[in-house]
Amino acid sequence: MDIKQALARVAERLDLNTAEMQGVMRQIMTGQCSDAQIGAFLMGMRMKSESIDEIVGAALVMRELAAPVTIGVERLVDTCGTGGDGMNIFNVSTAAAFVVAAAGGRVAKHGNRAVSGKSGSADLLEAAGVYLELSPEQVARCVESVGVGFMFAPAHHGAMKHAIGPRRELGLRTLFNMLGPMTNPAGVKRQVLGVFSQALCRPLAEVMARLGSVHVLVVHAQDGLDEISLAAPTHIAELRNGEISEYLVQPEDFGIKSQSLIGLDIEGPQESLALIRDALGRRKTEHGQKAAEMIVLNAGAALYAADQAGSLKEGVALAHDALHTGLARDKLEELASITAVFRQENQA
Protein backbone atom coordinates (compact mmCIF):
# COMPACT_ATOMS: atom_id res chain seq x y z
CA MET A 1 0.00 0.00 0.00
CA ASP A 2 1.35 3.45 -0.90
CA ILE A 3 0.78 6.72 0.93
CA LYS A 4 -2.02 7.91 -1.38
CA GLN A 5 -3.97 4.69 -0.89
CA ALA A 6 -3.39 4.93 2.86
CA LEU A 7 -4.66 8.52 2.95
CA ALA A 8 -7.84 7.50 1.16
CA ARG A 9 -8.36 4.69 3.68
CA VAL A 10 -7.65 6.83 6.73
CA ALA A 11 -9.94 9.61 5.43
CA GLU A 12 -12.77 7.09 5.74
CA ARG A 13 -11.63 6.30 9.31
CA LEU A 14 -10.66 2.79 8.27
CA ASP A 15 -7.70 0.98 9.84
CA LEU A 16 -4.65 -0.41 8.05
CA ASN A 17 -3.40 -3.88 8.85
CA THR A 18 0.15 -4.44 10.07
CA ALA A 19 1.63 -5.19 6.64
CA GLU A 20 -0.07 -2.17 5.05
CA MET A 21 1.23 0.07 7.82
CA GLN A 22 4.74 -1.28 7.34
CA GLY A 23 4.57 -0.38 3.66
CA VAL A 24 3.46 3.18 4.35
CA MET A 25 6.03 3.69 7.13
CA ARG A 26 8.85 2.50 4.87
CA GLN A 27 7.80 5.11 2.32
CA ILE A 28 7.75 7.84 4.98
CA MET A 29 11.04 6.81 6.57
CA THR A 30 12.91 6.51 3.27
CA GLY A 31 11.98 9.96 1.98
CA GLN A 32 9.38 8.90 -0.59
CA CYS A 33 6.55 11.06 0.80
CA SER A 34 6.03 14.82 0.74
CA ASP A 35 5.66 16.83 3.93
CA ALA A 36 2.00 17.42 3.06
CA GLN A 37 1.38 13.68 2.72
CA ILE A 38 3.14 12.89 6.00
CA GLY A 39 1.28 15.63 7.88
CA ALA A 40 -2.07 14.55 6.45
CA PHE A 41 -1.40 10.91 7.31
CA LEU A 42 -0.38 11.67 10.90
CA MET A 43 -3.40 13.92 11.44
CA GLY A 44 -5.75 11.35 9.91
CA MET A 45 -4.33 8.63 12.13
CA ARG A 46 -4.78 10.78 15.21
CA MET A 47 -8.36 11.69 14.33
CA LYS A 48 -9.46 8.09 13.87
CA SER A 49 -7.12 6.77 16.65
CA GLU A 50 -4.23 4.46 15.86
CA SER A 51 -5.04 0.74 16.01
CA ILE A 52 -2.84 -1.87 17.65
CA ASP A 53 -1.98 -3.31 14.21
CA GLU A 54 -0.92 0.12 12.97
CA ILE A 55 1.29 0.86 15.97
CA VAL A 56 2.92 -2.58 15.69
CA GLY A 57 3.58 -2.09 11.97
CA ALA A 58 5.09 1.35 12.48
CA ALA A 59 7.30 0.16 15.35
CA LEU A 60 8.58 -2.80 13.33
CA VAL A 61 9.77 -0.48 10.55
CA MET A 62 11.43 1.94 12.97
CA ARG A 63 13.23 -0.97 14.62
CA GLU A 64 14.29 -2.31 11.23
CA LEU A 65 15.82 1.04 10.20
CA ALA A 66 17.46 1.87 13.56
CA ALA A 67 21.21 1.72 14.19
CA PRO A 68 21.37 -1.16 16.71
CA VAL A 69 23.28 -1.33 20.00
CA THR A 70 24.51 -4.77 21.10
CA ILE A 71 24.96 -5.08 24.86
CA GLY A 72 26.14 -8.35 26.39
CA VAL A 73 24.14 -7.96 29.59
CA GLU A 74 21.14 -9.94 30.85
CA ARG A 75 17.83 -8.34 31.89
CA LEU A 76 18.39 -4.91 30.39
CA VAL A 77 15.65 -2.42 31.24
CA ASP A 78 14.55 0.96 29.87
CA THR A 79 12.70 3.79 31.61
CA CYS A 80 11.26 5.78 28.73
CA GLY A 81 7.89 7.45 28.33
CA THR A 82 5.92 9.07 25.56
CA GLY A 83 6.17 12.51 27.15
CA GLY A 84 3.54 15.07 26.32
CA ASP A 85 1.80 14.99 29.70
CA GLY A 86 2.08 18.78 29.97
CA MET A 87 3.11 18.65 33.64
CA ASN A 88 6.72 19.93 33.34
CA ILE A 89 8.07 18.17 36.41
CA PHE A 90 11.70 17.09 36.78
CA ASN A 91 13.13 14.15 34.80
CA VAL A 92 11.81 11.34 37.00
CA SER A 93 12.49 8.35 34.75
CA THR A 94 16.03 9.49 33.93
CA ALA A 95 16.83 9.93 37.63
CA ALA A 96 15.28 6.53 38.32
CA ALA A 97 17.74 4.93 35.88
CA PHE A 98 20.65 5.78 38.18
CA VAL A 99 18.89 4.29 41.20
CA VAL A 100 18.28 1.10 39.22
CA ALA A 101 22.01 0.97 38.40
CA ALA A 102 22.89 1.59 42.05
CA ALA A 103 20.70 -1.39 42.97
CA GLY A 104 22.56 -3.65 40.54
CA GLY A 105 20.30 -3.31 37.50
CA ARG A 106 21.40 -2.44 33.98
CA VAL A 107 19.66 0.35 32.07
CA ALA A 108 19.80 0.99 28.32
CA LYS A 109 18.12 4.39 28.35
CA HIS A 110 16.62 5.67 25.13
CA GLY A 111 15.68 9.34 24.92
CA ASN A 112 15.74 12.71 23.22
CA ARG A 113 15.63 16.43 23.80
CA ALA A 114 12.39 18.02 24.98
CA VAL A 115 9.71 18.48 22.35
CA SER A 116 6.80 19.89 24.35
CA GLY A 117 8.23 19.87 27.89
CA LYS A 118 10.93 21.91 29.62
CA SER A 119 13.64 19.22 29.91
CA GLY A 120 14.06 16.01 27.94
CA SER A 121 16.34 13.22 29.13
CA ALA A 122 19.05 14.33 26.70
CA ASP A 123 18.82 17.93 27.95
CA LEU A 124 19.21 16.80 31.56
CA LEU A 125 22.16 14.50 30.90
CA GLU A 126 23.92 17.13 28.82
CA ALA A 127 23.50 19.59 31.70
CA ALA A 128 25.13 16.99 33.96
CA GLY A 129 28.14 16.82 31.64
CA VAL A 130 27.20 13.60 29.86
CA TYR A 131 28.44 13.44 26.25
CA LEU A 132 25.61 12.25 23.99
CA GLU A 133 27.21 11.50 20.62
CA LEU A 134 28.29 7.96 21.44
CA SER A 135 28.91 5.03 19.12
CA PRO A 136 26.91 1.84 19.77
CA GLU A 137 30.07 0.26 21.21
CA GLN A 138 30.55 3.17 23.60
CA VAL A 139 26.94 2.94 24.80
CA ALA A 140 27.52 -0.75 25.52
CA ARG A 141 30.67 0.08 27.51
CA CYS A 142 28.69 2.59 29.60
CA VAL A 143 26.08 -0.03 30.48
CA GLU A 144 28.69 -2.66 31.28
CA SER A 145 30.87 -0.40 33.46
CA VAL A 146 28.45 2.14 34.98
CA GLY A 147 25.12 0.33 34.75
CA VAL A 148 23.52 3.06 32.62
CA GLY A 149 24.02 3.86 28.94
CA PHE A 150 22.17 6.57 27.03
CA MET A 151 21.10 6.21 23.42
CA PHE A 152 20.37 9.62 21.91
CA ALA A 153 17.43 8.94 19.62
CA PRO A 154 18.54 11.06 16.60
CA ALA A 155 21.84 9.15 16.49
CA HIS A 156 20.02 5.83 16.15
CA HIS A 157 16.93 6.79 14.15
CA GLY A 158 18.36 8.76 11.24
CA ALA A 159 15.33 7.94 9.09
CA MET A 160 13.21 10.07 11.43
CA LYS A 161 14.61 13.15 9.70
CA HIS A 162 11.96 12.77 7.01
CA ALA A 163 9.13 13.30 9.53
CA ILE A 164 10.68 16.07 11.63
CA GLY A 165 9.30 18.96 9.56
CA PRO A 166 5.67 17.78 9.43
CA ARG A 167 5.73 16.86 13.13
CA ARG A 168 7.06 20.27 14.12
CA GLU A 169 4.57 22.11 11.92
CA LEU A 170 1.62 20.10 13.26
CA GLY A 171 2.65 20.85 16.84
CA LEU A 172 0.48 18.00 18.12
CA ARG A 173 1.09 14.60 19.64
CA THR A 174 1.14 12.01 16.88
CA LEU A 175 1.87 8.35 16.32
CA PHE A 176 5.59 9.10 16.63
CA ASN A 177 5.21 10.06 20.31
CA MET A 178 4.17 6.48 21.02
CA LEU A 179 6.92 4.91 18.93
CA GLY A 180 9.96 6.25 20.81
CA PRO A 181 9.63 3.94 23.84
CA MET A 182 8.94 0.97 21.56
CA THR A 183 12.03 1.34 19.42
CA ASN A 184 14.91 1.06 21.89
CA PRO A 185 18.02 0.39 19.76
CA ALA A 186 19.34 -2.12 22.31
CA GLY A 187 16.23 -4.26 21.88
CA VAL A 188 15.31 -4.26 25.57
CA LYS A 189 12.46 -6.60 26.48
CA ARG A 190 11.81 -5.13 29.93
CA GLN A 191 10.75 -1.57 30.64
CA VAL A 192 8.57 0.96 32.41
CA LEU A 193 6.66 2.85 29.73
CA GLY A 194 4.88 6.04 30.80
CA VAL A 195 2.01 7.21 28.59
CA PHE A 196 0.08 10.47 28.29
CA SER A 197 -3.39 8.86 28.49
CA GLN A 198 -4.84 6.02 30.55
CA ALA A 199 -6.68 4.86 27.43
CA LEU A 200 -3.29 3.86 25.98
CA CYS A 201 -2.21 1.61 28.86
CA ARG A 202 -3.70 -1.71 27.81
CA PRO A 203 -3.38 -1.19 24.02
CA LEU A 204 0.33 -0.40 24.35
CA ALA A 205 0.84 -3.39 26.64
CA GLU A 206 -0.70 -5.48 23.84
CA VAL A 207 1.60 -3.83 21.30
CA MET A 208 4.65 -4.60 23.45
CA ALA A 209 3.55 -8.24 23.73
CA ARG A 210 3.37 -8.50 19.94
CA LEU A 211 6.80 -6.89 19.66
CA GLY A 212 8.31 -9.61 21.86
CA SER A 213 8.63 -7.86 25.22
CA VAL A 214 8.85 -10.02 28.35
CA HIS A 215 7.98 -7.70 31.26
CA VAL A 216 6.60 -4.19 30.78
CA LEU A 217 4.69 -1.83 33.07
CA VAL A 218 2.69 0.74 31.08
CA VAL A 219 1.78 3.52 33.50
CA HIS A 220 -0.42 6.63 33.64
CA ALA A 221 -1.32 8.50 36.82
CA GLN A 222 -4.75 9.95 37.53
CA ASP A 223 -3.20 13.41 37.91
CA GLY A 224 -2.04 13.19 34.28
CA LEU A 225 1.61 12.20 34.79
CA ASP A 226 3.27 9.66 32.52
CA GLU A 227 5.05 8.34 35.63
CA ILE A 228 4.03 6.59 38.84
CA SER A 229 2.81 9.61 40.79
CA LEU A 230 3.45 10.69 44.34
CA ALA A 231 0.19 12.67 44.34
CA ALA A 232 -2.46 10.36 42.90
CA PRO A 233 -3.26 6.72 42.13
CA THR A 234 -1.50 5.33 39.05
CA HIS A 235 -3.05 2.94 36.56
CA ILE A 236 -0.74 0.15 35.42
CA ALA A 237 -1.14 -2.36 32.60
CA GLU A 238 1.47 -5.02 33.29
CA LEU A 239 2.69 -7.41 30.62
CA ARG A 240 4.48 -10.37 32.13
CA ASN A 241 5.28 -13.57 30.26
CA GLY A 242 2.54 -13.00 27.71
CA GLU A 243 -0.22 -12.15 30.21
CA ILE A 244 -1.62 -8.65 30.78
CA SER A 245 -3.10 -7.52 34.09
CA GLU A 246 -4.38 -4.09 35.09
CA TYR A 247 -4.45 -2.49 38.52
CA LEU A 248 -4.12 0.74 40.49
CA VAL A 249 -1.30 1.60 42.88
CA GLN A 250 -0.80 4.53 45.23
CA PRO A 251 2.17 5.63 47.34
CA GLU A 252 0.69 4.25 50.56
CA ASP A 253 0.88 0.74 49.07
CA PHE A 254 4.66 1.09 49.48
CA GLY A 255 4.78 2.89 52.81
CA ILE A 256 5.14 6.32 51.19
CA LYS A 257 2.83 9.22 52.01
CA SER A 258 0.93 10.82 49.11
CA GLN A 259 2.02 14.42 48.60
CA SER A 260 1.33 17.21 46.14
CA LEU A 261 3.67 17.81 43.22
CA ILE A 262 4.32 21.39 44.34
CA GLY A 263 8.04 22.08 44.10
CA LEU A 264 8.69 19.30 41.60
CA ASP A 265 8.00 21.41 38.50
CA ILE A 266 10.98 22.89 36.70
CA GLU A 267 11.74 25.55 34.10
CA GLY A 268 14.67 23.82 32.42
CA PRO A 269 17.34 21.12 32.61
CA GLN A 270 19.60 22.95 35.08
CA GLU A 271 16.73 23.24 37.57
CA SER A 272 15.85 19.59 37.02
CA LEU A 273 19.48 18.58 37.58
CA ALA A 274 19.75 20.55 40.83
CA LEU A 275 16.62 18.88 42.19
CA ILE A 276 17.81 15.42 41.15
CA ARG A 277 21.26 15.92 42.67
CA ASP A 278 19.62 16.92 45.94
CA ALA A 279 17.25 13.94 45.78
CA LEU A 280 20.05 11.46 45.04
CA GLY A 281 22.38 13.08 47.57
CA ARG A 282 21.70 14.40 51.05
CA ARG A 283 18.14 15.64 50.40
CA LYS A 284 18.76 19.00 52.08
CA THR A 285 15.45 20.50 50.94
CA GLU A 286 11.82 19.49 51.38
CA HIS A 287 11.46 19.36 47.61
CA GLY A 288 14.54 17.14 47.34
CA GLN A 289 13.03 14.67 49.81
CA LYS A 290 9.76 14.66 47.89
CA ALA A 291 11.60 14.13 44.59
CA ALA A 292 13.51 11.23 46.15
CA GLU A 293 10.27 9.45 47.04
CA MET A 294 8.94 9.96 43.51
CA ILE A 295 12.18 8.57 42.07
CA VAL A 296 12.04 5.55 44.38
CA LEU A 297 8.51 4.66 43.21
CA ASN A 298 9.57 4.68 39.56
CA ALA A 299 12.95 3.03 40.07
CA GLY A 300 11.17 0.30 42.03
CA ALA A 301 8.90 -0.34 39.06
CA ALA A 302 11.94 -0.59 36.77
CA LEU A 303 13.67 -3.07 39.11
CA TYR A 304 10.50 -5.16 39.09
CA ALA A 305 10.25 -4.96 35.28
CA ALA A 306 13.90 -6.05 35.10
CA ASP A 307 13.07 -9.02 37.35
CA GLN A 308 15.61 -7.78 39.89
CA ALA A 309 12.70 -7.86 42.36
CA GLY A 310 9.89 -10.38 42.73
CA SER A 311 7.14 -7.79 43.19
CA LEU A 312 6.54 -4.08 42.75
CA LYS A 313 6.61 -3.63 46.53
CA GLU A 314 9.95 -5.44 46.77
CA GLY A 315 11.29 -3.31 43.91
CA VAL A 316 10.36 -0.07 45.69
CA ALA A 317 12.05 -1.28 48.89
CA LEU A 318 15.18 -2.17 46.92
CA ALA A 319 15.15 1.24 45.21
CA HIS A 320 14.73 3.00 48.57
CA ASP A 321 17.79 1.26 49.98
CA ALA A 322 19.84 1.95 46.84
CA LEU A 323 18.99 5.66 46.79
CA HIS A 324 19.90 6.12 50.44
CA THR A 325 23.40 4.69 49.93
CA GLY A 326 24.30 7.68 47.74
CA LEU A 327 25.48 5.33 44.99
CA ALA A 328 22.90 6.62 42.51
CA ARG A 329 24.41 10.10 42.55
CA ASP A 330 27.83 8.52 42.07
CA LYS A 331 26.48 6.67 39.00
CA LEU A 332 25.46 9.98 37.42
CA GLU A 333 28.97 11.36 37.91
CA GLU A 334 30.52 8.12 36.62
CA LEU A 335 28.49 8.36 33.41
CA ALA A 336 29.67 11.94 32.88
CA SER A 337 33.28 10.86 33.47
CA ILE A 338 33.30 7.87 31.13
CA THR A 339 31.57 9.79 28.34
CA ALA A 340 34.11 12.61 28.71
CA VAL A 341 36.77 10.03 27.84
CA PHE A 342 34.71 8.92 24.83
CA ARG A 343 34.37 12.54 23.71
CA GLN A 344 38.17 12.84 23.63
CA GLU A 345 38.46 9.55 21.72
CA ASN A 346 35.90 10.69 19.15
CA GLN A 347 37.52 14.09 18.66
CA ALA A 348 41.09 12.79 18.46
Curated annotation (Swiss-Prot):
EC assignment: 2.4.2.18
Ligand binding (Mg(2+) 1): S93, E227
Any Pfam family the entry gives: Glycos_trans_3N
Binding-site list for 5-phospho-alpha-D-ribose 1-diphosphate: 81, 84-85, 91-94, 109-117, 121
GO molecular function: anthranilate phosphoribosyltransferase activity; magnesium ion binding
Required co-factors: Mg(2+)
One Gene Ontology term, aspect cellular component: cytosol
Catalytic activity: N-(5-phospho-beta-D-ribosyl)anthranilate + diphosphate = 5-phospho-alpha-D-ribose 1-diphosphate + anthranilate
Entry keywords, A to Z: Amino-acid biosynthesis, Aromatic amino acid biosynthesis, Glycosyltransferase, Magnesium, Metal-binding, Transferase, Tryptophan biosynthesis
BP-aspect Gene Ontology terms: L-tryptophan biosynthetic process
Top EC category: transferase
Binding site for Mg(2+) 2: D226, E227
Origin: domain of life: Bacteria
Free-text comment on the cofactor: Binds 2 magnesium ions per monomer.
InterPro entries per UniProt: Anthranilate_Pribosyl_Tfrase, Glycosyl_Trfase_fam3, Glycosyl_Trfase_fam3_N_dom, Glycosyl_Trfase_fam3_N_dom_sf, Nuc_phospho_transferase
Residues that coordinate or bind anthranilate 2: R167
Binding of anthranilate 1, residues: G81, N112
Pathway terms, separated by semicolons: Amino-acid biosynthesis; L-tryptophan biosynthesis; L-tryptophan from chorismate: step 2/5
Similarity comment: family membership: Belongs to the anthranilate phosphoribosyltransferase family.
Protein role: Catalyzes the transfer of the phosphoribosyl group of 5-phosphorylribose-1-pyrophosphate (PRPP) to anthranilate to yield N-(5'-phosphoribosyl)-anthranilate (PRA).
Family matches, as NCBIfam families: trpD
Summary of subunit composition and partner proteins: Homodimer.
PANTHER family: ANTHRANILATE PHOSPHORIBOSYLTRANSFERASE (PTHR43285:SF2)
Protein name: Anthranilate phosphoribosyltransferase
